Structures are given as structure tokens and as C-alpha cells.
Amino acid sequence: KQLTDGAKELAKKYHAMVLKIEPDIKSDDKEFREIVTKLGFKIKDDAKDFRDEIQPRYVFRLDIKGKTEDEIFKAFHSKTRYNVRLAGRQGDTVKEGNREDLKDFHRIMIETGKRDGFMIRPLEYFEQMYDALAPEHMKVLMAYYDGKPISGVIPIMYGNKTWYLYGASSNEHRNLMPNYLLQWEMIKIALDRKSDIYDLRGVSGVVDENHPQYGLYRFKQGFGAEFTEFIGELHMDYSPVRYKLYKISETVFKRVRSLLMNRHKK
């Protein structure tokens, strides 16, 4: 209540139209759902595509509290263990990068966006994030083959959790499975930091083998993680008319963006 009352005062001061919160609360928490509803929040819990919201509603989370590397690795799916080992045998190496390595990461990220059909933030965004968070709360890991960067990831670490935030993979040497090795390295970082949870982040809420994002679901599931559904987006409308107009414009923007990305892929 203190949060919502304070937010209302700020909304009035700065002419805000809505307060949005996407809490780390599971969807089956009935008590929390009842509390926020009584406070006046509306719950948007219909997003199935993890790109529909700012924070993904469906994720895979790996409980690593009190576990050893061996225990975690043995709990991987057999194919996942094979691919992690394969990456090492094929000559993949992983190194922790620095701010300068963001240039290689971003170049590969653009390649990934073109292949998978999503828009990419500018290099400056990642540089500013690095300046604000690294090295304590953010790292850049790059996978190399024959001295050439072929894949990269950005994990962030806060409190008792480590999150896989961004990933990029080149169209070349994908058969060398660098993404499996990078996930394993991030899990080991989470263990070193005494994290309780390693969060592999978003997947589709549609669990169907024919769904275009099912491959991502299987990839993350292979690390022994638990499929987790959050409560969704909470929003409190301070100016319902303005917010409705905003949502209409947002829908139009997303449709135009999707058309542009599909055209670019062709």
C-alpha cells in the first residue's frame, strides 16, 4: 500500500498514465493475487510469447542452492551433457570479456536478430549497461573457435539469483554447440557467486512441438531447469483514456515492426 500510494503521488506530479510492475511471483500465488487486486491493480496474464512483455512470463529456472557442479551436470538431459562435452572436444573455448568485447558481441547479436527476426538494441545500450553493472553485477562471456568469436552471452547477478539476459550466436560453426558450453559456464559463475537460482529466462507459454519457439523450450529444458510461470504484468491506470490510446499505438508499432523484420529476413 505504501508503494501504490507513493506511486500515485508521483504519477500526479509527473502526469504519468500508468504504473506497471512485473514481479518475481509465481502465477499460483493466490494470496498475492488477492492483495494486489484489492490495491487496485489489474493483472495481465494472457501473454504467451515471451517477447510480448518487458519481462517474460514463462521461464526455465534451475535450483542450484547447495549443489555441486557434478550434481548439476548429472541432472542435465543426456543430449545436453553430450553437447557440452562436444563443444569442448571440438575446440570451443570460453573467455570472460570486457567492454571492448561488446563490439564482437553486438556484431554477432545483429546476425542473430536477422536470423531469428527480432530487433536489436544499439551497441551504446550494452556499453552503458556494462558501465553501470560490470564487473560485480554483469559479465560478458565469448565463445571462440580457432581464435574467432562465434557466440556470446551476458549474464547479470543480483542477490541470490543469476540471470541469462542476452545471447548471440553466429551463423557459422553452430554445429560446434558453443551455446551449450556458454550456458554451463554461466551456471558455474552462478555457483561461484553462491546464487540459489540460475534463470535461463524466457520461453513461449505454448508448449507444442509444432510451435516455432519449441526448439528454445527444449534447449533450456535440457539443463534440468523447471518450467516456471509468473503472475504476469500488474498495471494501475491513472489515466485510462490516455493509456488506452497508448496501447493502441503500441499494437500498431509492434505490427509494423514485425512486418519490417519479416521483410528484412527475406
Predicted segments — roles?
Residues 4-6, 127-239, 244:
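Aromatic (often tryptophan-rich) hydrophobic motifs at membrane interfaces
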Residues 12, 37, 88, 191-192, ...:
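Anion (oxyanion) recognition and catalysis
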Residues 38-67, 197-266:
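Active-site/acyl-donor-binding loops of N-acyltransferases
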